[in-house]
Design a protein with these regions (language model features):
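Conserved alpha/beta-domain cores
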Residues: 1-169, 175-177, 189
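Gly/Pro- and small hydrophobic-enriched strand-loop and loop-to-helix capping segments
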Residues: 179-194
Length: 194
């Protein structure tokens, strides 16, 4: 919390957190004008805890989770921005929709069915590797999907504009491949203590 307060004092206003319990604890003690982004795996039963204040959820990986976010946002009469997580990495441990699952969801989703969410883009995590060509290819693939959706399902939708990809170890590649939002933690705050 002290490191976040220090970053806040230096002018930072957008913060991401990958654990729901830690996010709610930090939100209670840090300044109220912080724009909180949730960037980790999210379970449906955790949505109610972050719904009152969360700005953007980067890690939507199922229709069930989308529906729960909509339900909890409705209880607070607010719209929550979401990004659909796309599984682009070689690792099985990573979460997200396959590109085909994403297309199927979006082509069949009626926006009026989820009035309290706003789909603003996609999020992806590349394979954790030193192979920069593999990382570049994975980011390139998600950017192609983003462009395809921007020109079809979201044609004319000014809100569908975010491509969240790139972390401390691979953000330069992500930026070159079209990222609009990078998630930097380790490079600023050091290794996380679990």
């Amino acid at each position: 919390v002290e490191a976040l307060q220090e970053a806040y004092n230096a002018g930072q206003r957008v913060f991401g957190e990958s654990r729901a319990q830690e996010l709610t604890a930090k939100q209670k003690v840090l300044p109220s004008d912080i724009e909180w982004h949730f960037i980790g795996p999210l379970q449906s039963n955790q949505v109610k805890d972050i719904a009152p204040f969360i700005h953007t959820i980067h890690s939507i990986d199922s229709l069930k989770l989308l529906q729960e976010v909509n339900k909890q946002a409705a209880k607070h009469d607010r719209i929550i921005r979401v990004l659909l997580e796309i599984h682009i990495a070689q690792e099985e441990a990573k979460h997200g929709f396959s590109p085909d699952e994403c297309r199927e969801l979006l082509y069949n989703l009626l926006p009026e069915a989820l009035p309290y969410i706003r789909i603003c883009g996609l999020m992806g995590m590349a394979t954790n590797t030193d192979d920069t060509s593999l990382i570049k290819n994975e980011f390139h693939n998600i950017h192609e999907l983003f462009t395809e959706l921007k020109n079809s399902v979201f044609k004319g939708d000014e809100y569908f504009c975010e491509l969240s990809m790139g972390m401390s170890h691979d953000y330069p590649i992500a930026i070159r491949e079209g990222s609009t939002m990078i998630r930097i933690g380790t490079s600023i705050f050091g290794e996380r203590e679990y």
